[in-house]
């Protein structure tokens, strides 16, 4: 709810309305001020009334709210990516502390709690001495199940925590996302996230020898990549198809294809990707 208050304040100030004018008969100026600061909520009827007072439609308001949330997600991910590739556990833990502090002062702490769990998952991926709690994984699963309209946040959440879940669950949830293609293809950024999620689901299925589910994601990736130039994603797919060959018993050909993909990442000047896929190769390829 505090996001709604912040967005409302931006609209009010940009339109040069005072607190008193915006509050009108709907609430007191102190109530509106607390709402803008995220310290309290407003009843739906009062909320719609204050929107009318500053002449903003609910459609325009919600568009701006989604953009506001999008910028929060992007800001967090911009901090996460360098920490992940540098194995900076202390940096992750600092971000976790910040999310906990935000949760404590928030009227809707779930968003920050889920961010904390996301960060814990990334810590566990980089350092095996850390573990995920089942309660945290259940909280994420419950949230995703109850959310009908996925945004960037849900795609990022599932896309980074999928490896902690049973392969059948990942395949089922992944299929549900893929089958909503018409929704995502209108939103370029979301479509790229869906492609990355499909690659992740494909990898997870192959790691667990779930070839029937893997074939579904392979076909989906072939379709969504099409003839477009997505060099990074194409090369990840090239590696994973090599991994599929290896897992199905064509070991020599599979190893050759995975090594080709790692060489391409090296030529492209992407040492972090080389290291990641070399680590994956070493984990699964047995002499």
Model features per residue range: what roles?
Residues 97-104, 138-146, 178-185, 218-227, ...:
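Amphipathic alpha-helical segments of tetratricopeptide repeats
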Residues 7, 78, 112-123, 156, ...:
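"A position-specific structural signal for the A-helix of alpha-solenoid helical repeats
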Residues 45-60:
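DNA major-groove recognition helix of helix-turn-helix/homeodomain DNA-binding modules
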């Amino acid at each position: 709810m505090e996001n709604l208050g912040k967005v409302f304040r931006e609209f009010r100030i940009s339109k040069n309305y005072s607190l008193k004018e915006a509050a009108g008969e709907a609430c007191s100026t102190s109530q509106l001020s607390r709402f803008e600061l995220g310290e309290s909520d407003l009843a739906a009827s009062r909320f719609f009334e204050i929107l009318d007072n500053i002449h903003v439609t609910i459609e325009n308001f919600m568009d701006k709210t989604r953009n506001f949330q999008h910028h929060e997600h992007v800001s967090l991910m911009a901090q996460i990516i360098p920490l992940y590739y540098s194995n900076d556990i202390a940096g992750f833990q600092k971000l976790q502390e910040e999310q906990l502090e935000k949760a404590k002062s928030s009227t809707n702490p779930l968003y920050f709690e889920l961010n904390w769990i996301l960060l814990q998952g990334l810590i566990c991926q980089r350092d095996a001495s850390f573990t995920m709690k089942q309660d945290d994984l259940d909280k994420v699963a419950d949230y995703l199940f109850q959310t009908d309209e996925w945004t960037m946040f849900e795609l990022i959440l599932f896309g980074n925590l999928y490896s902690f879940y049973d392969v059948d669950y990942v395949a089922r949830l992944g299929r549900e996302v893929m089958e909503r293609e018409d929704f995502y293809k209108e939103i370029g950024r979301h479509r790229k996230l869906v492609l990355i999620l499909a690659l992740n689901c494909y990898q997870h299925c192959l790691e667990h020898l779930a070839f029937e589910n893997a074939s579904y994601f392979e076909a989906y990736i072939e379709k969504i990549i099409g003839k477009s130039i997505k060099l990074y994603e194409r090369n990840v797919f090239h590696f994973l198809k090599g991994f599929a060959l290896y897992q199905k018993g064509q070991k020599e050909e599979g190893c050759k294809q995975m090594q080709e993909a790692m060489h391409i990442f090296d030529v492209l000047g992407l040492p972090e990707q080389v290291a990641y896929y070399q680590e994956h190769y070493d984990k699964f390829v047995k002499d």
